[in-house]
């Protein structure tokens, strides 16, 4: 159906001429940012120069961490229902002496190396991801402004920007007043040009690839696995199963150190023929072709992801570009935005100091550089054959999955003073099984609490009855209006003035269960005590009011802390994006030291 008929993904009426955040680009990165800002109750306008969302092709692979993120956002179900899943990878190779043959097969995300809750790649074209995020935004009253090409940005006063864009449907220039501008507008980002000294650094290689999405007719036996093919005469191919019985082929047209194939020559027919030569003696024909693309591999990172005033930012491909061979682009891009959204929310609301925004560049530029370093080695391994590629996968599989994307010590990731716990600051919280005390439901600790831009303060209490005095003292101190209680009061006032952006679906999530104590902190307790060992009424008021986040442990304590003694309490501070901010253990007589440690972590918050 034509966009003009069903209006899907369109702005209704004129965009507002003043907002808080303008996002340029409605691909996965821009939509992830705008969607989260809308959820947090922040006014946002999202501009896109296309008339509609992506219909076919482009990014297609969701890694385990991205699947987890969509589950945390309660948006994963349509993708889990309709996308293809890949659990394994096989390696094929030919030599001058032997025809094409399978040389190895392995689990894509081994439990002992990755430990992901969803140990597979989820395959669906980019438009399916965009549609889910668009639908969620629209349910909260935010619509993409289409046919809107970003033109320029200027500063009109302290903290005031004027964003100009071209309305392509009327050929007129329109302006929006905003406090922040975020460019999610791709590798040729125009927003990036308004950030001083932010040009891309790195290499444009000679490696070029053709990409085909379609339904294939073949006698190749591993059609429904991820397959890396290396031939001695016709380069490499990467096979990826897709939704609706399709397969994506990445077909190598020229190597990194070879002569680049002219883009005009790299037609659909040329790429098909190249693939047929590589797959000989197997039959390879296309029943349909839904999408075709080709690209030259560039491996570059922007020198800066934000301007000195922390008013203009870039995310996604605007900040980094690389090959598509490891399905990292959309995954990394969406997590750029996921990182930025909660920080913007806290600063805009006056709940955190503006310096918090500097951690966006520190953290996400590190991940971008880690990605490029991996991608360089990954592309080399593809050219070297099965043994090198298998080694590269094993060495980097945690990073590829997203689980191993780790941040350095800094404002938000406080060193644990040599504490040797399985979970460390700067790492994603580890999956763990627990049972909710209040209703006896078994849940995943990393998924159960909805994303409401709250820090989660987990108290791991091996034995509740012997720890009641510790819990009472700590809870009273945390609720004190001279400490975290004061920050909670400020957050409550902010969210009364500008509430969360709720949708009808939130009625079933019941976010009010998690904001009873605070809009900015969620307090949770995980215990190895039996349900019959204590009543909620035995707990201090702070934890009584947190009844939906009281958990009976299955394996979370061991996964996060290892062994905790009965006379110890473990505390883990988890950031709104699921990363561990700090972790520590104390004796039952150290409630005051525990409180000071928690308050010291939150020094970046406004009093």
Predicted regions and their residues:
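C-terminal helical "tail/cap" subdomain of flavin- and related membrane-associated enzymes
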Residues: 2-4, 12-14, 104, 345-480, ...
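Glycine-rich FAD pyrophosphate-binding loop
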Residues: 36-59
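Active-site-adjacent segment of FAD-dependent monooxygenases/related oxidoreductases
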Residues: 55-138, 157, 231, 240-241, ...
């Amino acid at each position: 159906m034509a966009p003009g008929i069903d209006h899907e993904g369109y702005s209704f009426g004129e965009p507002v001429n003043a907002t808080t955040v303008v996002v340029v680009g409605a691909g996965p990165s821009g939509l992830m940012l705008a969607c989260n800002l809308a959820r947090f109750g922040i006014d946002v306008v999202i501009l896109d120069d296309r008339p509609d969302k992506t219909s076919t092709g482009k990014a297609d692979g969701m890694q385990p961490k991205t699947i987890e993120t969509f589950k945390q956002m309660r948006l994963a179900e349509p993708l889990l229902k309709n996308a293809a899943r890949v659990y394994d990878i096989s390696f094929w190779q030919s030599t001058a002496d032997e025809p094409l043959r399978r040389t190895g097969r392995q689990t894509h995300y081994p439990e002992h190396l990755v430990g992901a809750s969803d140990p597979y790649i989820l395959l669906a074209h980019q438009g399916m991801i965009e549609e889910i995020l668009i639908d969620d935004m629209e349910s909260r009253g935010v619509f993409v402004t289409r046919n809107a090409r970003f033109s320029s940005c200027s500063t009109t006063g302290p903290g005031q920007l004027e964003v100009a864009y071209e309305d392509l449907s009327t050929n007129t220039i329109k302006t929006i007043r905003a406090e922040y501008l975020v460019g999610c507008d791709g590798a040729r980002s125009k927003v990036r040009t308004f950030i001083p000294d932010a040009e891309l650094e790195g290499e444009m290689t000679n490696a070029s690839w053709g990409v085909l999405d379609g339904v294939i007719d073949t006698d190749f036996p591993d059609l429904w696995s991820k397959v890396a093919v290396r031939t001695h005469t016709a380069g490499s191919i990467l096979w990826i199963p897709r939704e609706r019985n399709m397969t994506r082929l990445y077909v190598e047209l020229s190597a990194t150190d070879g002569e680049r194939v002219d883009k005009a020559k790299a037609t659909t027919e040329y790429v098909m023929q190249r693939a047929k030569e590589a797959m000989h003696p197997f039959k390879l024909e296309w029943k349909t072709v839904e999408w075709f693309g080709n690209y030259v591999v560039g491996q570059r990172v922007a020198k800066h992801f934000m301007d000195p005033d922390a008013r203009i930012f870039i995310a996604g491909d605007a900040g980094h570009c690389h090959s598509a061979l490891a399905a990292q682009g959309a995954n990394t891009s969406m997590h750029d935005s996921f990182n930025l959204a909660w920080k913007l929310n806290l600063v805009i609301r006056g709940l955190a100091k503006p310096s918090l925004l500097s951690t966006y560049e520190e953290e996400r530029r590190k991940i971008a550089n880690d990605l490029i370093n991996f991608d360089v080695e990954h592309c080399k391994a593809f050219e070297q054959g099965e043994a090198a590629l298998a080694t590269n996968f094993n060495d980097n599989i945690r990073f590829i999955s997203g689980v191993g994307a780790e941040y350095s010590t800094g404002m938000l990731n406080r060193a644990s003073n040599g504490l040797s716990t399985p979970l460390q600051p700067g790492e994603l919280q580890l999956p763990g099984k627990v049972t909710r005390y209040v209703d006896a439901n078994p849940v995943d600790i990393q998924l159960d609490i909805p994303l409401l831009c709250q820090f989660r303060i987990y108290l791991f209490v091996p034995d509740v009855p012997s720890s009641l005095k510790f819990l009472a003292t700590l809870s009273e101190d945390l609720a004190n209006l001279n400490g975290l209680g004061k920050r909670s009061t400020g957050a409550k006032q902010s969210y009364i003035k500008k509430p969360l952006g709720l949708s009808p679906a939130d009625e079933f999530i019941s976010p009010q269960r998690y904001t009873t104590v605070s809009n900015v902190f969620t307090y949770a307790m995980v215990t190895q005590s039996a349900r019959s060992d204590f009543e909620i009424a035995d707990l201090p008021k702070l934890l009584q009011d947190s009844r939906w986040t009281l958990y009976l442990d299955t394996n979370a304590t061991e996964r996060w802390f290892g062994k905790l003694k009965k006379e110890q309490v473990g505390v883990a501070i988890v950031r709104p994006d699921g990363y561990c901010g700090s972790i520590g253990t104390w004796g039952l007589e150290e409630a005051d030291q525990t409180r000071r440690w928690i308050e010291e972590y939150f020094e970046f918050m406004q009093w």
